[in-house]
Amino acid sequence: MSDMDHTCFDTAKIDKLQELRERGVTVYPYTFDRRDTVEEIKERFSAIEHDKSEEEVSTAGRVYVVRQHGKTIFADIGDSEGRIQLYLRKNDLGEEQFDLFKQYVDAGDIVGVVGHVFRTKMGEITVWVDRFELLTKSVCPLPEKFHGLKNVETRYRQRYLDLIMNEESRETFRARSRIISLLRQFLFERDYLEFETPTLQPIYGGANARPFTTHHNALDQKLYLRIAPELYLKRLVVGGFDKVFEIAKNFRNEDIDTNHNPEFTMVEVYEAYRDYNDMMNLTEEILSHLAEKVLGTTVCSFAGHDLDFSRPWRRLTMEEAVREYAGIDFPAMSLEELHAFGLEHCVEGCESAATRGEYLVLFFEHFGEKHLIQPTFIYDFPIENSPLAKKHRSKEGLTERFELFIAGMEMANGFSELNDPLDQKARLEQQDAKRRKGDLEAQMIDYDFINALGYGMPPTGGVGIGIDRLVMLLTGKDSIKEVLLFPQMKTAVPGQNGDKAEEGDGEE
Protein backbone atom coordinates (compact mmCIF):
# COMPACT_ATOMS: atom_id res chain seq x y z
CA MET A 1 0.00 0.00 0.00
CA SER A 2 1.14 3.53 -0.70
CA ASP A 3 1.70 6.08 2.03
CA MET A 4 -1.50 7.79 0.90
CA ASP A 5 -3.66 4.65 1.27
CA HIS A 6 -5.72 5.12 4.41
CA THR A 7 -7.77 1.93 4.05
CA CYS A 8 -7.99 -0.72 6.76
CA PHE A 9 -7.41 -3.58 4.29
CA ASP A 10 -5.58 -6.59 5.74
CA THR A 11 -3.10 -8.36 3.46
CA ALA A 12 -3.98 -11.85 4.69
CA LYS A 13 -7.69 -11.22 4.17
CA ILE A 14 -7.06 -9.83 0.69
CA ASP A 15 -5.09 -12.98 -0.15
CA LYS A 16 -8.00 -15.17 0.98
CA LEU A 17 -10.37 -13.09 -1.11
CA GLN A 18 -8.24 -13.59 -4.22
CA GLU A 19 -7.91 -17.33 -3.57
CA LEU A 20 -11.69 -17.68 -3.24
CA ARG A 21 -12.18 -15.94 -6.57
CA GLU A 22 -9.62 -18.22 -8.19
CA ARG A 23 -11.63 -21.18 -6.88
CA GLY A 24 -14.73 -19.80 -8.56
CA VAL A 25 -16.48 -18.78 -5.34
CA THR A 26 -18.87 -15.84 -5.65
CA VAL A 27 -17.54 -13.74 -2.79
CA TYR A 28 -20.22 -11.04 -2.89
CA PRO A 29 -23.48 -12.70 -4.02
CA TYR A 30 -26.56 -10.59 -4.66
CA THR A 31 -29.12 -12.15 -2.33
CA PHE A 32 -29.80 -14.87 0.21
CA ASP A 33 -33.10 -16.40 1.26
CA ARG A 34 -33.03 -15.53 4.96
CA ARG A 35 -36.32 -16.74 6.40
CA ASP A 36 -35.50 -16.46 10.11
CA THR A 37 -33.85 -13.84 12.28
CA VAL A 38 -31.76 -14.88 15.26
CA GLU A 39 -34.43 -13.70 17.69
CA GLU A 40 -37.16 -15.59 15.84
CA ILE A 41 -35.14 -18.81 16.04
CA LYS A 42 -34.50 -18.41 19.75
CA GLU A 43 -38.15 -17.67 20.49
CA ARG A 44 -39.53 -20.48 18.32
CA PHE A 45 -37.15 -23.08 19.71
CA SER A 46 -36.92 -21.87 23.30
CA ALA A 47 -38.17 -25.23 24.60
CA ILE A 48 -36.06 -27.46 22.35
CA GLU A 49 -33.98 -30.23 23.85
CA HIS A 50 -30.85 -31.91 22.52
CA ASP A 51 -32.38 -33.58 19.44
CA LYS A 52 -32.31 -31.66 16.18
CA SER A 53 -35.53 -29.95 15.15
CA GLU A 54 -37.50 -31.36 12.28
CA GLU A 55 -38.12 -27.86 11.01
CA GLU A 56 -35.44 -26.31 8.85
CA VAL A 57 -34.26 -22.76 9.50
CA SER A 58 -32.45 -20.28 7.29
CA THR A 59 -30.61 -17.35 8.83
CA ALA A 60 -27.66 -15.06 8.18
CA GLY A 61 -25.33 -12.75 10.03
CA ARG A 62 -21.84 -11.53 10.73
CA VAL A 63 -19.30 -14.01 12.08
CA TYR A 64 -17.89 -12.92 15.43
CA VAL A 65 -16.04 -15.99 16.66
CA VAL A 66 -14.79 -19.18 14.99
CA ARG A 67 -13.67 -22.14 17.14
CA GLN A 68 -12.18 -25.08 15.27
CA HIS A 69 -12.06 -28.58 16.78
CA GLY A 70 -10.74 -30.99 14.17
CA LYS A 71 -13.71 -32.19 12.15
CA THR A 72 -16.13 -29.81 13.85
CA ILE A 73 -16.38 -26.05 13.99
CA PHE A 74 -18.36 -23.81 16.33
CA ALA A 75 -19.00 -20.22 15.27
CA ASP A 76 -21.03 -17.31 16.58
CA ILE A 77 -22.96 -15.12 14.15
CA GLY A 78 -25.06 -12.06 14.84
CA ASP A 79 -27.72 -9.99 13.14
CA SER A 80 -29.49 -6.81 14.24
CA GLU A 81 -31.44 -8.72 16.91
CA GLY A 82 -28.82 -10.89 18.60
CA ARG A 83 -26.30 -13.69 18.30
CA ILE A 84 -26.56 -17.44 17.85
CA GLN A 85 -24.10 -20.32 17.75
CA LEU A 86 -23.46 -22.44 14.65
CA TYR A 87 -22.32 -26.06 14.65
CA LEU A 88 -20.62 -27.40 11.50
CA ARG A 89 -19.49 -31.01 10.96
CA LYS A 90 -17.31 -32.27 8.16
CA ASN A 91 -19.48 -35.39 7.80
CA ASP A 92 -22.56 -33.24 7.16
CA LEU A 93 -21.10 -30.54 4.94
CA GLY A 94 -18.72 -32.64 2.95
CA GLU A 95 -14.99 -32.07 2.73
CA GLU A 96 -15.09 -29.22 0.19
CA GLN A 97 -17.66 -27.08 2.03
CA PHE A 98 -16.15 -27.82 5.44
CA ASP A 99 -12.64 -26.90 4.31
CA LEU A 100 -13.99 -23.75 2.65
CA PHE A 101 -15.39 -22.57 5.98
CA LYS A 102 -12.34 -23.72 7.92
CA GLN A 103 -9.77 -22.03 5.68
CA TYR A 104 -11.54 -18.91 4.47
CA VAL A 105 -14.27 -17.77 6.87
CA ASP A 106 -12.98 -15.29 9.45
CA ALA A 107 -14.44 -13.05 12.10
CA GLY A 108 -16.10 -10.15 10.32
CA ASP A 109 -17.35 -12.16 7.33
CA ILE A 110 -21.08 -12.48 6.69
CA VAL A 111 -22.53 -15.94 6.05
CA GLY A 112 -25.92 -17.44 5.37
CA VAL A 113 -26.73 -20.87 6.78
CA VAL A 114 -29.46 -23.48 6.43
CA GLY A 115 -29.90 -26.18 9.03
CA HIS A 116 -31.78 -27.44 12.05
CA VAL A 117 -31.88 -26.29 15.64
CA PHE A 118 -30.76 -28.17 18.76
CA ARG A 119 -29.59 -27.41 22.27
CA THR A 120 -25.99 -28.23 23.24
CA LYS A 121 -25.01 -29.99 26.45
CA MET A 122 -24.12 -26.54 27.77
CA GLY A 123 -27.73 -25.50 27.17
CA GLU A 124 -27.09 -23.15 24.24
CA ILE A 125 -29.56 -22.98 21.36
CA THR A 126 -27.51 -23.74 18.24
CA VAL A 127 -28.02 -24.11 14.49
CA TRP A 128 -26.70 -27.45 13.16
CA VAL A 129 -25.56 -26.31 9.72
CA ASP A 130 -26.46 -28.43 6.69
CA ARG A 131 -25.11 -25.93 4.17
CA PHE A 132 -23.74 -22.41 4.18
CA GLU A 133 -22.93 -19.62 1.77
CA LEU A 134 -20.32 -16.90 2.12
CA LEU A 135 -22.25 -13.68 1.56
CA THR A 136 -19.57 -11.05 2.22
CA LYS A 137 -15.83 -11.43 2.68
CA SER A 138 -14.55 -8.70 4.99
CA VAL A 139 -11.08 -7.39 4.24
CA CYS A 140 -10.63 -5.32 7.42
CA PRO A 141 -9.90 -7.02 10.76
CA LEU A 142 -12.32 -6.63 13.65
CA PRO A 143 -11.00 -5.43 17.03
CA GLU A 144 -9.81 -8.13 19.43
CA LYS A 145 -12.87 -10.09 20.53
CA PHE A 146 -12.43 -10.02 24.30
CA HIS A 147 -12.01 -6.27 24.61
CA GLY A 148 -14.19 -5.05 21.77
CA LEU A 149 -13.93 -1.47 20.58
CA LYS A 150 -13.11 0.77 23.54
CA ASN A 151 -11.30 3.74 21.98
CA VAL A 152 -13.82 6.58 22.18
CA GLU A 153 -12.34 8.50 19.25
CA THR A 154 -12.57 5.43 17.01
CA ARG A 155 -16.10 4.68 18.17
CA TYR A 156 -17.28 8.14 17.09
CA ARG A 157 -15.32 8.32 13.83
CA GLN A 158 -16.10 4.75 12.75
CA ARG A 159 -19.60 4.30 14.13
CA TYR A 160 -20.17 1.33 11.83
CA LEU A 161 -17.37 -0.50 13.65
CA ASP A 162 -18.75 0.55 17.02
CA LEU A 163 -22.15 -0.85 16.06
CA ILE A 164 -20.60 -4.11 14.88
CA MET A 165 -18.74 -4.64 18.13
CA ASN A 166 -20.85 -3.06 20.88
CA GLU A 167 -24.36 -4.21 21.66
CA GLU A 168 -24.72 -1.28 24.06
CA SER A 169 -24.26 1.16 21.18
CA ARG A 170 -26.78 -0.68 19.04
CA GLU A 171 -29.26 -0.57 21.92
CA THR A 172 -28.73 3.18 22.34
CA PHE A 173 -29.65 3.86 18.72
CA ARG A 174 -32.56 1.44 18.81
CA ALA A 175 -33.81 3.50 21.75
CA ARG A 176 -33.28 6.73 19.82
CA SER A 177 -35.29 5.42 16.89
CA ARG A 178 -38.06 4.30 19.22
CA ILE A 179 -38.15 7.64 21.07
CA ILE A 180 -38.63 9.57 17.82
CA SER A 181 -41.26 7.09 16.63
CA LEU A 182 -43.17 7.32 19.93
CA LEU A 183 -42.96 11.12 19.83
CA ARG A 184 -44.51 11.21 16.37
CA GLN A 185 -47.20 8.78 17.43
CA PHE A 186 -48.00 10.89 20.50
CA LEU A 187 -48.48 14.01 18.39
CA PHE A 188 -50.39 12.26 15.61
CA GLU A 189 -52.83 10.83 18.16
CA ARG A 190 -53.55 14.40 19.29
CA ASP A 191 -54.24 15.60 15.74
CA TYR A 192 -51.01 17.52 15.16
CA LEU A 193 -49.88 17.64 11.54
CA GLU A 194 -46.23 17.10 10.63
CA PHE A 195 -44.68 19.43 8.07
CA GLU A 196 -41.29 19.99 6.46
CA THR A 197 -39.91 23.51 6.24
CA PRO A 198 -36.80 24.74 4.39
CA THR A 199 -33.34 23.77 5.60
CA LEU A 200 -31.72 26.25 3.21
CA GLN A 201 -33.04 29.69 4.06
CA PRO A 202 -32.38 33.16 2.61
CA ILE A 203 -32.91 34.67 6.09
CA TYR A 204 -32.14 32.78 9.28
CA GLY A 205 -34.21 33.21 12.41
CA GLY A 206 -36.11 31.56 15.21
CA ALA A 207 -33.22 31.59 17.68
CA ASN A 208 -30.20 33.61 18.70
CA ALA A 209 -27.32 31.66 17.19
CA ARG A 210 -24.54 31.96 14.64
CA PRO A 211 -25.52 30.30 11.36
CA PHE A 212 -23.65 28.29 8.76
CA THR A 213 -23.54 30.06 5.42
CA THR A 214 -23.41 28.68 1.89
CA HIS A 215 -23.81 29.93 -1.67
CA HIS A 216 -26.26 28.84 -4.33
CA ASN A 217 -24.38 29.04 -7.62
CA ALA A 218 -27.34 29.08 -10.00
CA LEU A 219 -29.11 31.84 -8.08
CA ASP A 220 -25.86 33.56 -7.14
CA GLN A 221 -27.36 33.93 -3.69
CA LYS A 222 -26.11 33.60 -0.13
CA LEU A 223 -28.10 31.07 1.89
CA TYR A 224 -28.07 29.84 5.48
CA LEU A 225 -28.59 26.46 7.06
CA ARG A 226 -31.54 26.88 9.37
CA ILE A 227 -30.95 27.47 13.05
CA ALA A 228 -34.63 26.76 13.81
CA PRO A 229 -37.85 26.08 11.86
CA GLU A 230 -39.89 28.44 14.05
CA LEU A 231 -40.70 31.27 11.68
CA TYR A 232 -41.84 28.93 8.91
CA LEU A 233 -44.04 26.87 11.25
CA LYS A 234 -45.69 30.06 12.50
CA ARG A 235 -46.44 30.95 8.88
CA LEU A 236 -48.38 27.67 8.72
CA VAL A 237 -50.42 28.69 11.76
CA VAL A 238 -51.20 31.97 10.00
CA GLY A 239 -52.27 29.91 6.99
CA GLY A 240 -54.85 28.00 9.01
CA PHE A 241 -53.10 24.91 10.35
CA ASP A 242 -53.91 25.06 14.07
CA LYS A 243 -51.71 22.20 15.34
CA VAL A 244 -48.35 21.69 13.64
CA PHE A 245 -44.97 20.15 14.37
CA GLU A 246 -41.66 19.39 12.72
CA ILE A 247 -38.84 17.09 13.75
CA ALA A 248 -36.04 19.14 12.29
CA LYS A 249 -32.31 19.06 11.78
CA ASN A 250 -30.95 22.42 12.90
CA PHE A 251 -27.45 23.81 12.40
CA ARG A 252 -25.65 26.30 14.62
CA ASN A 253 -22.06 27.38 14.11
CA GLU A 254 -21.09 27.08 17.75
CA ASP A 255 -18.75 25.24 20.08
CA ILE A 256 -18.78 21.46 20.41
CA ASP A 257 -18.98 19.97 23.91
CA THR A 258 -20.74 17.20 25.82
CA ASN A 259 -24.12 18.90 25.35
CA HIS A 260 -23.68 20.61 21.96
CA ASN A 261 -23.19 19.45 18.39
CA PRO A 262 -23.41 21.91 15.46
CA GLU A 263 -25.98 19.64 13.77
CA PHE A 264 -28.76 18.57 16.11
CA THR A 265 -32.37 17.42 16.14
CA MET A 266 -35.33 19.22 17.69
CA VAL A 267 -39.07 18.88 17.63
CA GLU A 268 -40.97 22.16 17.45
CA VAL A 269 -44.71 22.15 18.20
CA TYR A 270 -47.21 24.98 17.74
CA GLU A 271 -50.87 25.09 18.66
CA ALA A 272 -53.35 27.89 18.07
CA TYR A 273 -55.43 29.23 20.96
CA ARG A 274 -52.91 28.07 23.56
CA ASP A 275 -50.35 29.91 25.71
CA TYR A 276 -47.10 29.10 27.49
CA ASN A 277 -48.92 27.46 30.41
CA ASP A 278 -50.52 25.00 28.00
CA MET A 279 -47.15 24.31 26.37
CA MET A 280 -45.53 23.60 29.74
CA ASN A 281 -48.30 21.09 30.37
CA LEU A 282 -47.78 19.56 26.92
CA THR A 283 -44.02 19.30 27.47
CA GLU A 284 -44.57 17.51 30.79
CA GLU A 285 -46.99 15.15 29.13
CA ILE A 286 -44.67 14.35 26.22
CA LEU A 287 -41.56 13.65 28.28
CA SER A 288 -43.28 11.67 31.03
CA HIS A 289 -45.05 9.62 28.35
CA LEU A 290 -41.79 8.87 26.55
CA ALA A 291 -40.02 7.89 29.77
CA GLU A 292 -42.84 5.51 30.68
CA LYS A 293 -42.92 3.95 27.21
CA VAL A 294 -39.16 3.60 26.77
CA LEU A 295 -38.13 2.70 30.32
CA GLY A 296 -41.32 1.28 31.74
CA THR A 297 -41.05 3.83 34.55
CA THR A 298 -40.96 7.58 35.01
CA VAL A 299 -37.65 7.37 36.89
CA CYS A 300 -34.34 7.19 35.02
CA SER A 301 -30.71 7.26 36.13
CA PHE A 302 -28.43 9.90 34.65
CA ALA A 303 -25.02 11.17 35.80
CA GLY A 304 -25.49 9.75 39.29
CA HIS A 305 -29.01 11.15 39.72
CA ASP A 306 -32.39 9.43 39.74
CA LEU A 307 -34.51 11.74 37.61
CA ASP A 308 -38.24 11.61 38.27
CA PHE A 309 -40.40 12.45 35.24
CA SER A 310 -43.69 11.92 37.06
CA ARG A 311 -45.99 14.93 36.94
CA PRO A 312 -46.37 17.70 38.01
CA TRP A 313 -42.92 19.27 37.66
CA ARG A 314 -41.51 22.13 39.64
CA ARG A 315 -42.06 25.64 38.24
CA LEU A 316 -40.09 28.75 39.22
CA THR A 317 -40.02 32.22 37.75
CA MET A 318 -36.53 33.31 36.79
CA GLU A 319 -36.59 35.88 39.59
CA GLU A 320 -37.55 33.16 42.09
CA ALA A 321 -34.68 30.98 40.86
CA VAL A 322 -32.19 33.84 41.27
CA ARG A 323 -33.49 34.52 44.76
CA GLU A 324 -33.13 30.84 45.69
CA TYR A 325 -29.73 30.12 44.15
CA ALA A 326 -27.98 33.50 44.21
CA GLY A 327 -29.44 34.47 47.58
CA ILE A 328 -30.47 37.99 46.55
CA ASP A 329 -33.72 39.94 46.34
CA PHE A 330 -33.32 40.83 42.68
CA PRO A 331 -36.29 43.24 42.30
CA ALA A 332 -35.10 45.32 45.26
CA MET A 333 -31.58 45.89 43.91
CA SER A 334 -30.48 48.87 41.82
CA LEU A 335 -28.52 48.52 38.58
CA GLU A 336 -25.38 49.62 40.43
CA GLU A 337 -25.92 46.96 43.10
CA LEU A 338 -26.54 44.29 40.48
CA HIS A 339 -23.36 45.27 38.65
CA ALA A 340 -21.28 45.18 41.84
CA PHE A 341 -22.75 41.81 42.82
CA GLY A 342 -21.93 40.38 39.40
CA LEU A 343 -18.32 41.58 39.52
CA GLU A 344 -17.91 40.28 43.07
CA HIS A 345 -18.97 36.79 41.99
CA CYS A 346 -17.15 36.82 38.62
CA VAL A 347 -20.36 36.46 36.63
CA GLU A 348 -19.38 36.21 32.98
CA GLY A 349 -20.83 39.00 30.84
CA CYS A 350 -21.76 41.37 33.65
CA GLU A 351 -19.08 43.86 32.55
CA SER A 352 -21.15 44.75 29.49
CA ALA A 353 -24.64 44.24 30.92
CA ALA A 354 -26.75 47.39 30.75
CA THR A 355 -30.29 46.41 31.74
CA ARG A 356 -32.02 44.61 34.58
CA GLY A 357 -33.13 41.89 32.20
CA GLU A 358 -29.57 41.19 31.10
CA TYR A 359 -28.42 40.87 34.72
CA LEU A 360 -31.34 38.57 35.53
CA VAL A 361 -30.41 36.13 32.77
CA LEU A 362 -26.69 36.25 33.61
CA PHE A 363 -27.32 35.58 37.31
CA PHE A 364 -29.67 32.71 36.54
CA GLU A 365 -27.18 31.09 34.18
CA HIS A 366 -24.32 31.54 36.65
CA PHE A 367 -26.03 30.57 39.90
CA GLY A 368 -29.13 28.60 38.99
CA GLU A 369 -28.83 26.28 35.99
CA LYS A 370 -26.41 23.77 37.51
CA HIS A 371 -28.75 23.14 40.47
CA LEU A 372 -31.78 22.23 38.37
CA ILE A 373 -31.43 18.45 38.43
CA GLN A 374 -35.05 17.30 38.63
CA PRO A 375 -37.35 18.49 35.83
CA THR A 376 -37.94 22.20 36.46
CA PHE A 377 -39.59 24.91 34.40
CA ILE A 378 -38.05 28.37 34.61
CA TYR A 379 -40.50 30.94 33.28
CA ASP A 380 -41.12 34.67 32.82
CA PHE A 381 -37.94 35.68 30.95
CA PRO A 382 -36.80 39.26 30.34
CA ILE A 383 -37.88 40.82 27.08
CA GLU A 384 -34.25 41.62 26.17
CA ASN A 385 -33.41 38.02 25.25
CA SER A 386 -36.85 36.89 24.10
CA PRO A 387 -37.55 38.67 20.79
CA LEU A 388 -40.17 36.16 19.61
CA ALA A 389 -42.13 35.79 22.86
CA LYS A 390 -45.25 37.71 23.80
CA LYS A 391 -45.01 40.42 26.45
CA HIS A 392 -46.14 39.21 29.86
CA ARG A 393 -49.80 39.95 30.44
CA SER A 394 -49.13 41.50 33.88
CA LYS A 395 -45.38 41.86 34.52
CA GLU A 396 -43.61 44.83 32.96
CA GLY A 397 -40.34 44.03 31.19
CA LEU A 398 -40.94 40.27 31.07
CA THR A 399 -42.26 37.83 28.48
CA GLU A 400 -44.33 34.68 28.63
CA ARG A 401 -41.41 32.39 27.93
CA PHE A 402 -40.22 29.23 29.68
CA GLU A 403 -37.31 26.85 29.53
CA LEU A 404 -37.22 23.32 30.90
CA PHE A 405 -34.10 22.18 32.74
CA ILE A 406 -33.21 18.60 33.65
CA ALA A 407 -29.84 17.48 35.05
CA GLY A 408 -28.60 21.05 34.65
CA MET A 409 -29.29 21.03 30.90
CA GLU A 410 -31.76 23.10 28.94
CA MET A 411 -34.21 20.63 27.42
CA ALA A 412 -36.99 22.79 26.00
CA ASN A 413 -37.85 26.38 25.20
CA GLY A 414 -41.38 27.69 24.70
CA PHE A 415 -43.49 30.83 24.52
CA SER A 416 -46.81 32.40 24.31
CA GLU A 417 -45.92 33.32 20.73
CA LEU A 418 -45.67 36.98 19.80
CA ASN A 419 -48.40 37.70 17.25
CA ASP A 420 -48.47 41.51 17.33
CA PRO A 421 -46.86 42.43 13.97
CA LEU A 422 -45.89 45.94 15.08
CA ASP A 423 -44.20 44.70 18.25
CA GLN A 424 -42.50 41.89 16.31
CA LYS A 425 -41.20 44.32 13.71
CA ALA A 426 -39.74 46.59 16.38
CA ARG A 427 -38.04 43.72 18.20
CA LEU A 428 -36.54 42.18 15.08
CA GLU A 429 -35.29 45.60 14.03
CA GLN A 430 -33.53 45.81 17.40
CA GLN A 431 -32.03 42.36 16.79
CA ASP A 432 -30.89 43.32 13.31
CA ALA A 433 -29.25 46.47 14.66
CA LYS A 434 -27.30 44.37 17.17
CA ARG A 435 -26.25 42.02 14.39
CA ARG A 436 -24.98 44.90 12.27
CA LYS A 437 -22.93 46.11 15.22
CA GLY A 438 -21.17 42.75 15.47
CA ASP A 439 -23.44 40.51 17.57
CA LEU A 440 -23.01 37.30 15.57
CA GLU A 441 -25.89 35.56 17.36
CA ALA A 442 -28.50 38.30 16.89
CA GLN A 443 -31.36 37.58 14.51
CA MET A 444 -31.95 39.03 11.06
CA ILE A 445 -35.13 40.89 10.29
CA ASP A 446 -37.55 38.80 8.23
CA TYR A 447 -40.11 41.12 6.66
CA ASP A 448 -42.00 38.28 5.01
CA PHE A 449 -42.57 36.73 8.44
CA ILE A 450 -43.70 40.11 9.79
CA ASN A 451 -46.07 40.44 6.84
CA ALA A 452 -47.46 36.98 7.63
CA LEU A 453 -48.23 38.16 11.15
CA GLY A 454 -49.83 41.21 9.58
CA TYR A 455 -52.52 38.97 8.09
CA GLY A 456 -53.29 37.71 11.59
CA MET A 457 -51.96 34.81 13.66
CA PRO A 458 -54.29 33.55 16.40
CA PRO A 459 -53.08 33.34 20.01
CA THR A 460 -50.53 30.53 19.81
CA GLY A 461 -48.34 28.51 22.12
CA GLY A 462 -45.11 26.92 20.93
CA VAL A 463 -42.30 24.78 22.28
CA GLY A 464 -39.06 23.29 20.99
CA ILE A 465 -37.63 20.17 22.63
CA GLY A 466 -34.08 18.91 22.10
CA ILE A 467 -34.25 15.31 20.89
CA ASP A 468 -30.55 14.55 21.32
CA ARG A 469 -30.45 15.62 24.96
CA LEU A 470 -33.69 13.78 25.64
CA VAL A 471 -32.14 10.60 24.26
CA MET A 472 -29.12 11.22 26.49
CA LEU A 473 -31.36 11.29 29.55
CA LEU A 474 -33.43 8.24 28.64
CA THR A 475 -30.38 6.13 27.75
CA GLY A 476 -28.14 7.36 30.58
CA LYS A 477 -25.45 8.75 28.25
CA ASP A 478 -23.47 11.74 29.52
CA SER A 479 -22.18 12.92 26.12
CA ILE A 480 -24.21 13.99 23.12
CA LYS A 481 -21.72 12.15 20.89
CA GLU A 482 -22.98 8.88 22.37
CA VAL A 483 -26.48 9.45 20.98
CA LEU A 484 -25.51 10.84 17.55
CA LEU A 485 -24.64 8.21 14.99
CA PHE A 486 -22.12 10.44 13.27
CA PRO A 487 -21.17 13.35 15.56
CA GLN A 488 -19.15 16.24 14.19
CA MET A 489 -15.43 15.59 14.59
CA LYS A 490 -12.33 17.41 13.47
CA THR A 491 -11.05 15.82 10.28
CA ALA A 492 -8.31 13.35 11.16
CA VAL A 493 -7.39 11.86 7.78
CA PRO A 494 -6.54 13.75 4.55
CA GLY A 495 -9.40 13.37 2.10
CA GLN A 496 -11.94 12.53 4.80
CA ASN A 497 -13.58 15.93 4.43
CA GLY A 498 -14.10 15.53 0.68
CA ASP A 499 -10.94 17.36 -0.40
CA LYS A 500 -8.17 15.75 -2.39
CA ALA A 501 -5.83 13.90 -0.09
CA GLU A 502 -2.71 15.12 -1.83
CA GLU A 503 -3.60 18.71 -1.01
CA GLY A 504 -3.15 17.94 2.68
CA ASP A 505 -6.42 19.55 3.75
CA GLY A 506 -7.65 18.32 7.10
CA GLU A 507 -4.29 17.32 8.50
CA GLU A 508 -3.82 18.09 12.15
Swiss-Prot record:
Gene Ontology molecular function terms on file: ATP binding; lysine-tRNA ligase activity; magnesium ion binding; tRNA binding
E.C. no: 6.1.1.6
Binding site for Mg(2+) 2: E410
SUPFAM superfamilies associated with the record: Class II aaRS and biotin synthetases (SSF55681), Nucleic acid-binding proteins (SSF50249)
Any one Pfam family match given in the protein's UniProt record, by short name: tRNA_anti-codon
Family from the record: Belongs to the class-II aminoacyl-tRNA synthetase family.
Name of the protein this chain belongs to: Lysine--tRNA ligase
Organism (species): Methanoculleus marisnigri (strain ATCC 35101 / DSM 1498 / JR1)
Gene name of this polypeptide: lysS
